[in-house]
Amino acid sequence: MGKENTPEIAIKYIDFIKKRDPGIKKTYLFGSYANGTITADSDIDLAIVFDSLADTFDMQVLLMKLRRKFDTKIEPHAFRDSDFNSSNPLANEILKHGIEIY
């Protein structure tokens, strides 16, 4: 599994973000789209891991604003690379069950 299993709109969104910020290290699809339990109400959960990030909250706000250009079902989650590990409960779940896109 990988990029080919990711909704096209999510790929376009990630490509757009990568052009704006080349400091993206990795991206993951997680949640219902990753585990195959998609419903009509499912959002598209994306973990976006940055090499360095001064403020995850500010980046989270920016990512949420930028998603409006694509689809409000996209649910981006910003992480610093240094925080994206098994000691972070959400990151741990993503590492175990998510699909690495880039």
Each PLM stretch: what is its role?
Residues M1-K26, N35-A40, D51-Y102:
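Catalytic core of pol beta-like nucleotidyltransferases
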Residues S32:
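Conserved H-loop
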Residues S42-I44:
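Short, conserved active-site loops that position catalytic residues or coordinate cofactors/metal ions
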Residues A47-V49:
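Short hydrophobic/aromatic beta-strand micro-patches
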